[in-house]
Curated annotation (Swiss-Prot):
Record-annotated S1-like domain positions: 1-73
Cystine crosslinks: none
The encoding gene: infA
An example Gene Ontology molecular-function term: translation initiation factor activity
Family: Belongs to the IF-1 family.
Binding partners and assembly: Component of the 30S ribosomal translation pre-initiation complex which assembles on the 30S ribosome in the order IF-2 and IF-3, IF-1 and N-formylmethionyl-tRNA(fMet); mRNA recruitment can occur at any time during PIC assembly.
Keyword line: Cytoplasm, Initiation factor, Protein biosynthesis, RNA-binding, rRNA-binding
Compartments (UniProt record): Cytoplasm
Biological role: One of the essential components for the initiation of protein synthesis. Stabilizes the binding of IF-2 and IF-3 on the 30S subunit to which N-formylmethionyl-tRNA(fMet) subsequently binds. Helps modulate mRNA selection, yielding the 30S pre-initiation complex (PIC). Upon addition of the 50S ribosomal subunit IF-1, IF-2 and IF-3 are released leaving the mature 70S translation initiation complex.
HAMAP family, per the entry: IF_1
Cellular component terms per the entry's GO annotation: cytosol
Species: Leifsonia xyli subsp. xyli (strain CTCB07)
InterPro entries in alphabetical order: NA-bd_OB-fold, RNA-binding_domain_S1_IF1, TIF_IF1
This protein's record includes keyword RNA-binding: yes
Protein name (database record): Translation initiation factor IF-1
Phylogenetic placement of the source organism: Bacteria, Bacillati, Actinomycetota, Actinomycetes, Micrococcales
Amino acid sequence: MAKKDGVIEIEGSVIEALPNAMFRVELTNGHKVLAHISGKMRQHYIRILPEDRVIVELSPYDLTRGRIVYRYK
């Protein structure tokens, strides 16, 4: 898979599940962001629950929203 330029990947922990496959994630630096699941994770039916450790991609333009790209096992 090609890496995107300019995205920030950071680890975090899911603190709450919201409607429409959105999640509130607390990052390792203490910030809280709103994140949705990436298309590949949705396609492969990967479930995300509160307290899961995940990797979130953030855009440099809006650091309050992100995309969950990986869930640790």
